[in-house]
């Protein structure tokens, strides 16, 4: 999974961030986080499409939280599976990409109904698709008027400023 935020930004002190990384089988994302100096715990579900609160509780017990201000839970799964489970998060961030199409908020409403923030990633690919940011945002806001929506490209480092601010100010 590409990251919707960059820990390379100097306003985010990596030593004060920890990540609980969910994946079916691999530790590839966790390894990338650790290479950036971020305390990381890997959770492999070996088939389940989401993390559950008891898994988060166990992971938190394994993390040295001294000096940690922010714990990011990177859940696994698709837009449907992960939305059904509360993990104790303070901010729920949903992410979709322009390559997935405009219909996701209406086809899979639960994530968008419960998200505090929605990231539309891969915005740099929009010229090669028929994706409409305006339609996508309107559909999100028809489900959840309070959701903040940001467009970005994690790969190209476009539009990350408000996302960095979100983490830097928490």
Q: What do these predicted regions represent?
A:
Residues 1-90, 100-103, 108, 112:
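Nucleotide-state-sensitive switch-loop elements of NTP-binding domains
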Residues 22, 97, 154:
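Cofactor-binding loop segments of dinucleotide-utilizing enzymes, especially the Rossmann-like FAD-
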Residues 100-134:
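A glycine- and Lys/Arg-enriched "phosphate-lid" helix/loop adjacent to the NTP-binding pocket
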Residues 117, 125-170:
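Canonical P-loop GTPase G-domain recognition
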């Amino acid at each position: 999974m590409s990251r919707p935020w960059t820990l390379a930004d100097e306003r985010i002190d990596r030593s004060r961030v920890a990540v609980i990384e969910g994946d079916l089988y691999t530790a590839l994302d966790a390894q990338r986080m650790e290479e950036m100096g971020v305390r990381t715990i890997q959770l492999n579900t070996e088939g389940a499409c989401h993390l559950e609160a008891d898994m988060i509780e166990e992971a938190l017990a394994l993390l040295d939280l001294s000096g940690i201000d922010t714990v990011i839970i990177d859940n696994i799964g698709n837009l449907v599976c992960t939305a059904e489970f509360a993990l104790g998060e303070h901010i729920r961030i949903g992410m979709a990409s322009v390559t997935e199409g405009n219909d996701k908020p209406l086809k899979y409403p639960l994530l968008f109904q419960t998200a505090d923030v929605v990231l539309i990633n891969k915005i740099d690919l929009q010229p090669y698709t028929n994706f409409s940011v305006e339609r996508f945002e309107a559909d999100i806001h028809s489900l959840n008027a309070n959701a903040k929506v940001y467009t970005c490209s994690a790969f190209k480092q476009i539009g990350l400023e408000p996302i960095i601010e979100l983490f830097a100010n928490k």
